């Protein structure tokens, strides 16, 4: 299906925007960061919402499928940003979520 790479890239960009938008307030609230971090937070979360709106599918289907990509992306964040290696159980869970995302987004639909 030709839409798959575009959909997956859009989901990945959406997850990055959401993760950044959630991580910046964490830096402010828990790590002593500046309150000015809330400005890029707002921008990042606005980009997140805009990216979710670009999918041609029904919004509920997009949100459900996006959840699987978000989980996998959050585990990559755990590894790359937090420096914590995901366990095999983390990876198995993410694989199950990504399989669910693929079923939701790429299964045949009747008109």
Curated annotation (Swiss-Prot):
Q: How does it sit in the membrane?
A: Multi-pass membrane protein
Query: Where do the TM regions start and end?
Result: 8-28, 32-52, 64-84, 91-111
Q: Which GO terms describe its cellular component?
A: plasma membrane
Q: Name the keywords, alphabetized.
A: Cell inner membrane, Cell membrane, Membrane, Transmembrane, Transmembrane helix
**The keyword Cell membrane is assigned to this record:** yes
Q: Which InterPro entries match?
A: UPF0060 (IPR003844)
| Primary localisation category | membrane
- Localisation: Cell inner membrane
Q: Which HAMAP family match?
A: UPF0060
Q: Which PANTHER family match?
A: UPF0060 MEMBRANE PROTEIN YNFA
What family does the database annotate? Belongs to the UPF0060 family.
What's the name of the protein? UPF0060 membrane protein XCV3198
**Which organism was this protein described from?**
Xanthomonas euvesicatoria pv. vesicatoria (strain 85-10) (Xanthomonas campestris pv. vesicatoria)
């Amino acid at each position: 299906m030709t839409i798959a790479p575009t959909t997956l890239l859009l989901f990945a960009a959406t997850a990055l925007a959401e993760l950044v938008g959630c991580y910046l307030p964490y830096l402010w609230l828990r790590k002593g960061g500046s309150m000015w971090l809330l400005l890029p937070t707002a921008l990042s979360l606005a980009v997140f919402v805009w990216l979710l709106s670009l999918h041609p599918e029904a919004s509920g289907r997009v949100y459900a499928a996006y959840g699987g990509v978000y989980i996998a992306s959050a585990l990559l964040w755990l590894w790359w940003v937090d420096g914590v290696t995901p366990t095999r159980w983390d990876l198995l869970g993410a694989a199950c979520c990504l399989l669910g995302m693929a079923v939701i987004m790429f299964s045949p639909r009747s008109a």
